[in-house]
Amino acid sequence: MDKEKLDMLYEKYVPEEKLLIAKSARKTIRYIEKNTENFPNKYKVLRDKIISTSYDILKNIYRANIFQDINDKKEIVVNIQMLNFYLEEAYKKEILTNKKLISYTNYLLELDRMTRSWFKYEKSK
């Protein structure tokens, strides 16, 4: 299969992201991956935890949307809190600047607000 056909197939089957919280999580993942690639090798485990947890947030968003389970929504909040903890640890180890930590925190705050609004919406049904 040539490249043009593959591109056409990809465009045809690319998912249309209608869930705003998932869009926000994907944006956060891209930001985190871009900005953690310069972590020192001795903090590789911390970097991997940060990236892994950000993917877990997106996975749990999709699970909560599909299965409509309150536990999946709670797991999103837990993952956001854990990710915030990992980022604070990176700041304490002087891997992240204060400016970067604030930037990461703003992304997480947006996700947290969206998740909690989702909780309230589901409870009001």
Q: What are these model-predicted stretches?
A:
Residues 1-125:
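Amphipathic alpha-helical assembly/interaction segments
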